[in-house]
Each structure stands twice: as structure tokens, then as C-alpha cells.
Amino acid sequence: VHLHVVDHPLAAMALTVLRDERTPRDRFRPALHDLATMLVYEATRALPVMPVTVTTPLATTAGTRLAAEPVVAPVLRAGLGMLPAALALLPTAHTAFIGLARDETTHQPTAYLESVPDDLAGHPVFLLDPMLATGGSALHCLRLLLDRGARGITVVAVVAAPEGLVALESGLPADAAAELTVVAAAVDERLNDTAYIVPGLGDAGDRIFGLM
């Protein structure tokens, strides 16, 4: 697993807003959008491109365009908070949706939605989830995406736990793990007894969408 922690003062400032328990939803969502923009920007740095020729008002010059249409896959529900930023940077991307609910006793995910293209071969795939905690949800999604032909997947997370990174390394086939990239704003200290990331930022889904 290739880990890239985005080290940038603006990313650190946005992450600070997200961590602060006093941040209300109307400030949390814009801060997440800003940070997701920076994370996706870094995550797409190695996107394959192809040369094109364009004509400016003055001359003909060389340019580039994407070699294949990307696929972004937010993990519902928290990953939806990162989707607008991803689509703003990748307007031609296809969107897959994976809905998971966490069992609060076992901390294991149960899928309730898997709207994913049948053939992902040749498409750069970006899995969006603010929290990489135990790695259980990410592993479920990654196995699904791999079964549909995806290779060289990139996980885009706000914060990751060391336990989650270890789970990805050990829970995937060696070749898939070697091709996997994780882009995050921070790797935090640990998981607590209820499998929440410490210091983390709480329940990202609740902080984005509220809890009635």
C-alpha cells in the first residue's frame, strides 16, 4: 500500500476545523469540501493522460486530456460529503455508489447498496470515505471494485488509523495491495474501544448530515 499524507498548510487548517467539536454543520461541510478538493487534487496527480493539439488565438500548441474516464465511488453516507469536490475536479467522471452500515457491536460493515459499473477495467478508480478506521468498510469496497476489474485503486480519506492501513495491507491479495494508494490528510494515533479514530473528528456522517 502506497501512503501519501498531504502536507499543506491549507489542508491542515481545514482539518483543524473538521476536528473541532464546536464546528457546526454549516461550517463543517464547506471545510470538508475544501479539504476534499486538495486531497483529490493530490490523488489525481498520476492520472494517465494523452496528448492533443489545440489552436489558441495565436498558434497551434500541444496539450493533454485524460486517457480514460475516471470513476469516483463515495462510500455512503459520509463519502457523499466528498463527492462534489471530486466531481468539480473530474467533471467527466462516472459515479459509483456503495452504501454500508456498520454493526456497532462487531464493527463490521453490511452492504445495503452496491451501484457499481460491471466493468471497471482501464478506468482510474477513486474510493471516497472521510474515515479509514478499522479498514473493514474499505476492504469490502475494494474487493467489490477489484471483482469488477478495477486496478490501481486510490482511497481518498480525511484521516486514517494505523490499524486500518495494516488491515488493507494484510486483507488484499499481494498484487492488489501493491497497487493500492491511500491519500489522506493525516494518520492519527489509534482506534478506541468502539473503533473510532483518536483523535479523529467524530462521526463524519453525523457531522455532515446531522442526526435526528
What is the role of each PLM region?
Residues V1-M212:
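PRPP-associated nucleotide enzymes
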